[in-house]
Regions:
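Histidine-dependent nucleotide/RNA phosphoesterase domain, centered on the 2H-phosphoesterase fold
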Residues: 1-184
Length: 184
């Protein structure tokens, strides 16, 4: 099964993000926008994982994060990963709490590499993906094509989740496989 590990957001934060993006979503249907319920910060993409290996990954999550405290983050500016100067991925950066998120990702990276998962070559950038360029769209965007004003409150991240991702023609469906609650 296709899996990834991520930080889950409170529903009210997802809703606030979507309200802020509403006009851009209407104005730019050429982009593939992430659905509201699927908003998250990926810590580690695992790819295809044999079913029998999934419980061991859940056990590792428990081992790494059980007893950790919930932490506060604040999302920042809308930014883009580019390909030849054009927007490939549109994302929201982390203004506060990014160091803690990096620490979580690094701990996962170290632990999961011992289980045979490939280490990421690129440096981890904590971010929330909000849209991707469609491969076959004729419309291309530059970073300054976006005017998104975010005014989101700080919020607590209190769970780290192992997700199963099922790809469908209408978009991915995420299912929680394992949830590790962070303490108050």
């Amino acid at each position: 099964m296709r899996c990834f590990i991520a930080l889950e957001f409170p529903p009210e934060i997802k809703s606030s993000i979507y309200k802020s993006l509403k006009q851009e979503i209407q104005d730019k249907p050429e982009l593939k926008w992430v659905s509201e319920e699927n908003l998250h910060i990926t810590l580690k993409f695992l790819g295809e994982v044999p079913d029998k290996k999934v419980p061991a990954i859940g056990d590792q999550l428990e081992k790494i994060f059980k007893g950790d405290k919930k932490f506060k983050i604040k999302l920042g500016e809308v930014q883009a990963f580019l390909n030849r100067g054009e927007v490939r991925v549109l994302w929201i950066g982390v203004e506060k709490g990014g160091d803690k998120i990096k620490k979580c990702a690094n701990e996962l990276e170290k632990s999961l590499s011992k289980m045979g998962f490939k280490k990421e070559k690129r440096e981890f950038v904590p971010h929330l993906t909000i849209a991707r360029a469609r491969k076959y769209s004729k419309k291309r965007f530059k970073p300054n094509d976006f005017d998104i004003e975010l005014n989101l409150p700080d919020f607590y991240v209190d769970e780290i989740v192992l997700f199963k991702s099922t790809l469908t023609p209408s978009g991915p469906i995420y299912e929680k496989i394992k949830v590790v609650k962070l303490n108050g």
